[in-house]
Amino acid sequence: MKNILSIQSHVVFGHAGNSAAEFPMRRMGANVWPLNTVQFSNHTQYGHWTGCVMPASHLTEVVQGIANIDKLKTCNAVLSGYIGSAEQGEHILGIVRQVKAANPDALYFCDPVMGTPEKGCIVAPGVSDFHCQQSLLAADIVAPNLPELELLGGRTVHNVAEAVETARALCEKGPKIVLVKHLSRAASREDSFEMLLVTPTDAWHISRPLVEFERQPVGVGDLTSGLLLVNLLKGVALDKALEHTTAAVYEVMLVTKEMNEYELQLVAAQDGIANPRHHFQAVRLS
């Protein structure tokens, strides 16, 4: 069984960050070691929340505790998501180096959350620069959405072809795999939800139906990153990993819609996460 050190935000109520990714990754058969960058009452898109950002040193101290009991060598991957400060990010890269020293085969999967102010997702000053200048170079796998892809790539992306070009340019800086979690306005169709998985030599495109909500649930990207990582650690081929991730997230969205809920209904959808009823084919791009 694979072990994932998941360094992300945590909400007490609802699902975002570790609160969105931890249970689905466990349901997929991975051991998850959740390490929280922030602890908030709820996610920030409610407009009101309480809680705190963890000191950057807290992250390092906790991981050192794991090293002290000689278990860091069993860590197969570090997954990072929302960070509360650029200083936290620098400490996370130190943790990645420490994990890789203990297990050279360990992967670093970076979900470079840079904030979407118009949706209420705000990151601290310096976080975007940290991702562009540091985490991108250290990551084995990076999973931006479209605005994050544009920031990382330093260009505007208008269509699928340009998204592939930009993702492949990122591969030249460090990552072996780039997952574009949501093509949004660069998608080939307005009525579909589309993603890309890009390596230096290959690219796959996948689409599924959009599930419309009055208020779009939060944590979908965190869920997506976690599921893809588990699939990759299991040795699933890239295209099949993308297909399962897409179908599993779709199952969660359908159940959440059916239950008329704002928060992702992960427990109710757990069987669909492990064994999706729907299938979407990843198309290899020439």
From Swiss-Prot:
InterPro entries, alphabetized: PM/HMP-P_kinase-1 (IPR013749), PyrdxlKinase (IPR004625), Pyridoxal_kinase_PdxY (IPR023685), Ribokinase-like (IPR029056)
Residues annotated for ATP binding in this entry: D111, A143, E148, K181, R208, P209, L210, V211
Cofactor(s) this protein requires: Mg(2+)
Catalytic activity annotation: pyridoxal + ATP = pyridoxal 5'-phosphate + ADP + H(+)
GO cellular component, one term: cytosol
E.C. number(s) listed in UniProt: 2.7.1.35
Pathway involvement of the protein, from the record: Cofactor metabolism; pyridoxal 5'-phosphate salvage; pyridoxal 5'-phosphate from pyridoxal: step 1/1
Keywords: ATP-binding, Kinase, Magnesium, Nucleotide-binding, Transferase
Positions annotated to bind substrate: S9, T44, Q45, D222
GO molecular function, one term: ATP binding
BP term (GO), one: pyridoxal 5'-phosphate salvage
Cysteines paired by S-S bonds: none
Description of how the protein assembles with itself and partners: Homodimer.
Function field: Pyridoxal kinase involved in the salvage pathway of pyridoxal 5'-phosphate (PLP). Catalyzes the phosphorylation of pyridoxal to PLP.
Family named by the database record: Belongs to the pyridoxine kinase family. PdxY subfamily.
Protein name, entry field: Pyridoxal kinase PdxY
Organism this protein belongs to: Pectobacterium atrosepticum (strain SCRI 1043 / ATCC BAA-672)
Lineage, highest ranks first: Bacteria, Pseudomonadati, Pseudomonadota, Gammaproteobacteria, Enterobacterales
